[in-house]
Amino acid sequence: MMKLKACRLLLMLAPTLLPALAVSGEAALTETTLQTSHQIFSVAGGKDMDALKCTTPQRRKSPERRPTPSQGDNRKQDPAPAGSEEEIIPLSEEEEAAMLKKALAPPSSEELRRNLPKSEWIKKFHATLSAASRQRIARVGIWGGSHMAAEFFTTEFRQALQERYGVGGAGHINLLYGRPGLNLPVSAFCRTGEWNEELPPRTVNSPKIFSGLGLYAMTANSPHAALEIDLRSTHAKYRAHQVALHFLRQPDGGTFDLIVDGENLGTLDTQGPRAIGVVEIKALMPLSRIELRVSEQKSVTLLGLFAEDHQGAVLDNFGVAGAAGNYWRGVEPELFKAAVSQRSYDAVVLAYGTNDVTGNNWNPERYRQDYRQILIAMRAAMPQAACILITPGDRVTRFYVKKIVKVKINKRKTVNKTQVTTHYDLLTFPQRHAQAAAIQSELGDEYQCMVWDMSIVMREMGGAYALMKRSPPWMANDLIHLTPAGYREMARRFVGWLDLSSGKAQ
């Protein structure tokens, strides 16, 4: 299984072995749940290494998005003739007023009432985290799409949690880093060689993937593949005394070298019956760096990396741009449960919806059925965790109306000009998001989940269109995402709703 330096391995868990006591400095065996294996190393830590700098770019560029040409009797235009000029025509006050009249109405008193926090559930949430943080790490996991992946919202949430319950570290370090829209709470992440990413299918009947807690897998098949992470955080208070790497044991699994703070701890063999494998590094002093080097031409599949301190609170951010709620139905459930058995959560936050309501075939009843299955899957793995649902926020769509006109320059000359007017649909997606939020609220009660309706919060502030017109704007140019300032403002409102802004727990 493992080629090791002497006295490094403290504990090894395997599904077919009988219980035994762990002895410091010696390999020992104990029982664990089905489909898991666990190994622990003890290291000194405390090395002050130079800041990690990647030799190759780590971020992939987002594909350029262009507005969809508008359709209609007088809107669909042929391309402008060669030599023509485009003129941007702003909406007149009358046109804007007429457009705003067609917008989704501000939230009703009933909607505002529905979005009030349930005091008993809030108290239970805090009691759970308070009790956990006094004895160990209190863990909160948040799953969602690009709103969470960007780390602006989650950074505010994480800091509020840790101001209340203690700084427990950075938490999940998403190994998919490099994907557009995904940021990390650590200093640097370098990936070399060929790595293949796998995310769950969105369609229900597609084959399920083998994943860990993050609902993703990342596989290398080449000895030139490597990862190196600077564990020192962008937040000065975060310290990594404990690091856990989750990987997939599989019949054709390969090997990789594990290097911590520049010292090679050994070669890990991932071959075996399909299971969740965990390698945990515990240090007396904070760790600076971890490196993994694939050492042969066989598959090595990684499922997640986690960095934390000894006590306090941790927020594991599993946000991935483009993720949909149906991802929960696209992973092997027993393997996911095995991952949860290795890293359990006191509270779960699901922030889905924006990517679930797109397309031309929006059907609220089908969404209700799908979202119920998401909650069933979550509760099957984490039946006792406190639960919060964050609904999709407000969103509008932009389209352009083009008109080619002839403009007289002088008595003898005219030129073609393309006049472009920007219009906004303030009803279609705000209405869908409001419907999705209402469905989440109904199902939340059934599955013991509090619901924070971000669409109501944004509509109460005037909606996405009004947030775009702020100076500085709180809505990004695509009118789907928010700006960093907008995400921070939403997070502050969420933190207030959750009664996290009242300071350190007694």
Which positions does each model-derived feature cover?
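Soluble non-cytosolic domains of exported or imported proteins
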Residues: 116-119, 134, 138, 147-156, ...
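Sec-dependent N-terminal signal peptides
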Residues: 1-48
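Hydrophobic/aromatic beta-strand patches that form the interior of the parallel beta-sheet core
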Residues: 316, 388, 450-452
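Conserved, well-structured beta-alpha core segment at the onset of a catalytic domain
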Residues: 5-8, 24-27, 116-166, 357-358
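Membrane/wall-proximal cationic-aromatic binding patches
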Residues: 48-142, 197-200, 205, 211-226
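A short helix->loop->beta-strand "cap" motif at the edges of active sites that frequently abuts
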Residues: 382-387
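Catalytic His-Asp segment of secreted/periplasmic serine-dependent ester chemistry enzymes
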Residues: 333, 395-506
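Conserved SGNH/GDSL esterase-like catalytic core that processes O-acyl groups on lipids
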Residues: 139, 147-372, 376, 380, ...
